[in-house]
């Protein structure tokens, strides 16, 4: 339930806010696409943590590049 709400918030950002801003993300996939994938793959808690970590790295002094969402690791 929370995961869906967070994904919806990111989708709203992608549709309404992002088109008004110049492209600035230094990574592929974009930070918002990364957030959606992280939330869908890892759930609300870990997906949010991965998204915050990614957003903290997205600044002019970081080289950027390809940064995919980590795969799920099986529980032992």
Curated annotation (Swiss-Prot):
* SMART domains from the UniProt entry: Haemolytic
| Record flagged with keyword GTP-binding | no
Where in the cell is the protein located? Cell inner membrane
An example GO CC term for this entry is: plasma membrane
List the keywords (alphabetical).
Cell inner membrane, Cell membrane, Membrane
Answer yes or no on keyword Transferase. no
Give the bilayer topology: Peripheral membrane protein
Matches recorded under Pfam families: YidD
The family this protein is said to belong to = Belongs to the UPF0161 family.
State what this protein does: Could be involved in insertion of integral membrane proteins into the membrane.
List, alphabetically, the NCBIfam families matched: membrane protein insertion efficiency factor YidD (TIGR00278)
Protein name per Swiss-Prot or TrEMBL? Putative membrane protein insertion efficiency factor
